[in-house]
């Protein structure tokens, strides 16, 4: 195993910055300590230089145990110094002495009051100095050689450019969209497998497709492509990853949740991601005693265990459908029973990814499948082992066994290594930018032994080294594999991943290793990751770029290198979510273990618990049997905690609240109000996510989190923030509300006494009845760092809040999920004024959901339009298109009400030079109330152009995505092939549809996706069927089904 130095060097760099800041403080240090800190600073700087030399000179060599142990000592002392400094920062009130010119007496009082903590820290620093001296002496004593003494002539590292990489090169990427991609060189195979999955079996029984092959050969890629293509033909679908170390309850619960959500959606054009009606918020009733909150009695625990063990039939649970909250408390027996009941009368398709043993199939999967199901259901299984595949598909075609009654014939498909020209074709297809094709490509694809994972990763390496000479690539091939390669084994895969990892700059190594926090197969949000990188200090201001821009550049480079796989793009063309390949995740996890960078408890792989201190903890287990899985771990130095799954217990009492900086509890159902109170004691916390938890209130003590940068409370029961949130000086992102249900988060405002609200004789109020959350004395001048304010609610009583928005001059995104104000109210005028002002300050994203539509229509003649907008969303009954939209040359994404869908509107919008996606929408909930009105408006709109909406020729030069989401979509026509020349995808969701004409002449249009909601009339179904059956190009998908 190679010596990993990426994360260690990044930690050292961050630490040196903190030491420099500490030395600059005039009043904080006890006499004599400044010299110790300076010594530690100089010693660690030399160690950092040594680390950097190691990463450049000696990577590709196996390091002896002495160097590895010495590196471990460097890392440990650096971590301990960082903890000491962070502890110092929160124990001493720096601002009170440094922000003012204090008198001699005040200075002495400060020194007296802080004498004890400063003395304690001085003692710890002295000990750390001694440790640093000992580490330096030990290196000489035991002969740890300098990097220049090591021979690097055979190093496989293509390193000419990486250390000095210009990150601005990767800051901006061209917007693009993800579509269903065929695995390279497998067109015929995919067609055959798709046909087998969709054609009925003679006895209409359940059938299993097992896809078998070596890790990295493309099993999951094939399975996912098939699943996405055919899933729309089934009543319900679910996919789950199992892997080597799985949790039975979590596997079953994941499948059940997916099936349940599809039933709840009922085929409508909009659906909620959670059941808002069946779950009660935490804290909505009277607060229980602390003893009741902190521990259950033995009797209660016994009853809960008994309930989980009993079948639902004995608990009276078969009468009605279980709620999401009930499912979260079910045991395995109840989960199996509920799944069997829900699937019994449905035609289902399941994707079970990465099964490692026949026991898993027989004991976990088979028990929940209905024994009698004649609906032609299908199961897709992926596994590395032929024996497991044969167990899952016992009646596959290579066997002489015939189908048994009630079951269809199974299929086992083996995925082999690529041969012939296929490796080179995949290599060329995996390089994002056009590059000159040379013999280099053939040589590099050949050493990958036909393994797709190795090929695409090596192609990413080439893409990021465009100026490297062919001779250097030839040397690289020879150093990696001196002998010809036919097929690649695990050691060969590791060599190639080593080569690609070693080419990364130190910052990118750290960012890549950080991904080992997430579970196998997890769909990772790009924005969530970027905010966490910033909070951890991995992405800092550099080369004139902001932290956010640097984080985006790092992400783009990892994607360009094919070390991560984008799986979902937003309508703005940027990556929304991505995944890490299983083998890449295993690789970076091994590196993280070596550096003690990430500690994972639970998850899909068995991970040896570190004997040293835990720094970043990822809890991935689920269920009560994992509740005490952190026993034996030293958690006093945990700086980052992430929870995945339904843990019953998280050991908050074991953490040092003074050093935790990242707390990501998204989706943890065990979070209680008392936990949130404890979180407010984590004084250096920078990132807090309690998204999708059952918390209903944020305590006022949140003001103590003066370093907090991100507060994510989306999809919780929190309806209003406390007034103290206005005192968070460093807050950058406040994310609240629920976009699916349009539930908004109220910003606080302070009520004034009634005497101040009495009108004057002229009928006017003497002063506002409320104060906005930024109008309080303590909050004045704060929140200047706020960049994102998303998911808020503005109503008639929010005039003070609307006025306070003026002060958020750094705001880049404002999303109002619920707006309900009357035109004569002061709130109307204040909000309009605030939006005009923020638009002039650099607002880039504006989203407004206006329930009565008066406000969005008032934007038409706005005197100072937001000229820097990149994304604009206006929801409601829009009467006319704001005339200033055409002046916004930076606009990339536009979502507007379908009520302004006219040929004239399209004529106006076609000249926007940067427009990537255009969406006409109307929410289903609003349409139910105004269905006749909306339909009448659309009928009038099309009458102006002979009964159809005509897409104008030419222009729309950048538009690649066109979407219509509404109950009624009128007739649309593309009369000229020059209309929307860059268009790649059309998406439509509707209940009533009048037709789509001329799409076959659009040269770049690849896919049309149609989703028909329940209740559609026969004429609509006929038009959809006709479009599907009579269109060869582009491909037409109806509810996910691609045309033949």
Curated annotation (Swiss-Prot):
Protein family according to the UniProt entry: Belongs to the disease resistance NB-LRR family.
Gene from which this protein is expressed: PIK6-NP
Protein name: Disease resistance protein PIK6-NP
Location of region: Disordered: 258-302, 737-771
Function per UniProt: Probable disease resistance protein. Resistance proteins guard the plant against pathogens that contain an appropriate avirulence protein via an indirect interaction with this avirulence protein. That triggers a defense system including the hypersensitive response, which restricts the pathogen growth. At the opposite of cultivar Kusabue, the cultivar Nipponbare doesn't recognize the effector avirulence protein AVR-Pik from M.oryzae.
InterPro entries xref list: Disease_R_plants, LRR_dom_sf, LRR_R13L4/SHOC2-like, NB-ARC, P-loop_NTPase, RX-like_CC, Rx_N, WH-like_DNA-bd_sf
Keyword terms, alphabetized: ATP-binding, Coiled coil, Leucine-rich repeat, Nucleotide-binding, Plant defense, Repeat
Matching PANTHER family: DISEASE RESISTANCE PROTEIN PIK6-NP (PTHR23155:SF1013), DISEASE RESISTANCE PROTEIN RP (PTHR23155)
LRR repeats by residue range: 635-657, 682-705, 706-728, 808-834, 840-862, 866-888, 889-911, 935-958, 980-1004
A Gene Ontology molecular function term of the record: ADP binding
Matching Gene3D superfamilies: 1.20.5.4130, P-loop containing nucleotide triphosphate hydrolases (3.40.50.300), Ribonuclease Inhibitor (3.80.10.10), Winged helix-like DNA-binding domain superfamily/Winged helix DNA-binding domain (1.10.10.10)
Region Structured coiled coil (CC) domain: start-end pairs: 3-184
CDD domains noted in UniProt: RX-CC_like (cd14798)
Organism from which the protein derives: Oryza sativa subsp. japonica
